[in-house]
């Protein structure tokens, strides 16, 4: 009988239980945040990358992070000037 119990163990695996607990902890931490830390750095990097190709005013790049149900949506709006391409 011990062999059958070992082969057909019905107890939940500890790895699965740990995974579920970790997912709960991560979900709670995400809900508790007031705002993402990475947005200022992302904004600076986007300005640098876009400026390589187009002369753009840094104030014309807007970034926002919105929650829609279980999803987080990152919106990036760039106002591009007409005929102001930078030659690489």
UniProtKB/Swiss-Prot annotation:
Cross-referenced InterPro entries: MinE (IPR005527), MinE_sf (IPR036707)
GO biological process: cell division; regulation of division septum assembly
Positions in coiled-coil regions: none
Keywords of this entry: Cell cycle, Cell division
A Pfam family: MinE
Family matches, as NCBIfam families: minE, PRK00296.1, PRK13989.1
Function statement: Prevents the cell division inhibition by proteins MinC and MinD at internal division sites while permitting inhibition at polar sites. This ensures cell division at the proper site by restricting the formation of a division septum at the midpoint of the long axis of the cell.
Family: Belongs to the MinE family.
Protein name per its UniProtKB record: Cell division topological specificity factor
UniProt organism field: Herminiimonas arsenicoxydans
Higher taxonomy: Bacteria, Pseudomonadati, Pseudomonadota, Betaproteobacteria, Burkholderiales
């Amino acid at each position: 009988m011990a062999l059958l119990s070992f082969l057909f163990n019905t107890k939940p695996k500890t790895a699965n239980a740990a995974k579920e607990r970790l997912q709960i902890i991560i979900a709670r931490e995400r809900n508790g945040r007031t705002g993402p830390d990475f947005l200022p750095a992302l904004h600076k990097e986007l300005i640098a990358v876009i400026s390589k190709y187009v002369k753009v005013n840094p104030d014309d790049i807007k970034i926002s992070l919105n929650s829609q149900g279980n999803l987080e949506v990152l919106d990036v709006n760039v106002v591009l000037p007409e005929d102001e391409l930078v030659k690489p």
